[in-house]
Amino acid sequence: MRLIIRTNYNDISKWAANHVAMRIKEFSPTKEKPFILGLPTGSSPIGMYKNLIEMNKIGKISFENVVTFNMDEYVGLDKNHPESYNSFMWNNFFSHIDIKKENVHMLNGNAINLTNECTEYENKIKSYGGIMLFVGGIGPDGHIAFNEPGSSLKSRTRLKTLTQDTIIANSRFFENDINKVPKSALTVGVGTIMDSKEVMIIVNGHNKARALRHAIEKGVNHMWTISTLQLHKNAIIVSDEAATYELKVGTVKYFNDIEKDNFNNDI
């Protein structure tokens, strides 16, 4: 597992965007052979999205032959609701780039049969040959997507009941009223993410420091979803300095030494 440590959020956002763009350009996607990209919502990837939008505008990267799959969606929230993840993605990314609408795939939290919706989502991913790069963020407890602590490390896309901590944390998007926050969501599973050819997780802020320590210095533990990345053959964590405060000095020095030639990844 790789750990890229940059100074601040702006720096890790730029690095992450450059990495996504580099992978797409290396693949040279076509209509018949698109690049398959997994994407997250939340505050962590917003900076990356802004950088990718700018790169798209100046012609550094195109999303014309990119197919996307998002990580999760609330259950029972209309897709046009301002806090739905569908709205988030179109407002913060898709509407600003040259991606084809038919190439955007998102879970439907209002499907009549939620179990079938999850199964069909998994099958759709498989029909494209799997996800080439899955980008994600984490919560303070190390969860990825809505794979809360205790999630099976082999879990697939499914319906999940949200923990009270997650509901309280997300209430800031719902007028700080926990009664307005959906109580469940559809989410890709840990196994779904781990099946991707490459996984890149963005970690920023001192409140993620404990989770990063569990990801890097502790063993694999289903109570810390991010620790599963230790088992992936091609995983990258991109972290700002604030999130490294609970790592040992030697750990930080080690990763800085081996990654120093990769800090500038401009394309």
Curated annotation (Swiss-Prot):
It holds the Pfam family Glucosamine_iso. One of its GO terms (cellular component) is cytoplasm. InterPro entries: Glc/Gal-6P_isomerase, Glucosamine6P_isomerase, Glucosamine6P_isomerase_CS, NagB/RpiA_transferase-like. Allosterically activated by N-acetylglucosamine 6-phosphate (GlcNAc6P). Pathway: Amino-sugar metabolism; N-acetylneuraminate degradation; D-fructose 6-phosphate from N-acetylneuraminate: step 5/5. The record marks 151, 158, 160-161, 254 as: Part of the allosteric site. One of its GO terms (molecular function) is glucosamine-6-phosphate deaminase activity. Its EC number is 3.5.99.6. Coiled coil: none annotated. GO terms for biological process: carbohydrate metabolic process; glucosamine catabolic process; N-acetylglucosamine catabolic process; N-acetylneuraminate catabolic process. The active site is at 72 (proton acceptor), 141 (for ring-opening step), 143 (proton acceptor), 148 (for ring-opening step). It catalyses: alpha-D-glucosamine 6-phosphate + H2O = beta-D-fructose 6-phosphate + NH4(+). The keyword Membrane does not apply. It comes from the Bacteria. Keywords: Allosteric enzyme, Carbohydrate metabolism, Hydrolase. It is an enzyme of class 3 (hydrolase). Belongs to the glucosamine/galactosamine-6-phosphate isomerase family. NagB subfamily. HAMAP family: GlcN6P_deamin (MF_01241). Catalyzes the reversible isomerization-deamination of glucosamine 6-phosphate (GlcN6P) to form fructose 6-phosphate (Fru6P) and ammonium ion. This is Glucosamine-6-phosphate deaminase. The lineage of its organism: Bacteria, Pseudomonadati, Spirochaetota, Spirochaetia, Spirochaetales. The gene is nagB.
